[in-house]
Amino acid sequence: MKFIAVLIAAIASLSAVQAQKAIPYDTVVPIPSQTSKTDAQKAAVKYHPQLHIEDGCHPYAAVQADGAISDGLKWSGPQDGACKGSPLGSQVYARSTWVKGKWAIMYAWYFPMGQAPVPPVGLGHRNGWEYAVIWLDRPTADNSTLLGVSLSAAVGWSKEAPAKQKWMDGNSLKVSYYYNNIFRNTAVKYTEEKGEFQTLITWDQLPDAARNALINTDWDETPFNVARVKMPMKDGVFMEKLTGAYPF
């Protein structure tokens, strides 16, 4: 009975993927940045982190305005394979909320493929998400103070409160995407290297079709989701991630 339940869950998960319109990863058009109207949106722009690529893929847009999603890139060959950047541009997603009296802004990057030991698939998998969290005392751009930072590390979270100045470029956290030789997976880490900025779109600025596609897509193609690839901003996952990232 337990095996049957697992099999049904796997089939349901596959159906959820098939229900979304998937297009080639390098044809997904990033959603243009919007004019910031709320304090939370303005704060997300002010603390927009920059991403330096040390190893692996460059970030791409995961979804476009009509809800069509990236079909990712099958793991094969070199770490950066055919994913050295889209001519259409790239995207970073932001969502924010209160956590234990601190204002948390999560920024998430999508990668067409990632590396991790995933038996029996091999050393990599289609689709990957990495994220950074900026912790503020209040959700404003004018008079807020950066209290701490967190990153999705090779294992668990890397948390710092306060952030070291060598990792900051003004109000922007410097983040590096790299391959961790110890745990044999791709992840993000703090860096002193300057990176690039991707087109920022906040969760509440996303078109409904795009947001629903991000929520309803199962981004983990591995058998029984052993790679644990999840869109970190979807309801039910977002607060779980922020609770784990809390650095105080």
Curated annotation (Swiss-Prot):
It is found in: Secreted. Pfam families: NPP1. The keyword Kinase does not apply. Glycans are attached at residue 143. GO terms for cellular component: extracellular region. Secreted effector that contributes strongly to virulence during infection by P.capsici. This is NLP effector protein Pc121494. The lineage of its organism: Eukaryota, Sar, Stramenopiles, Oomycota, Peronosporales.
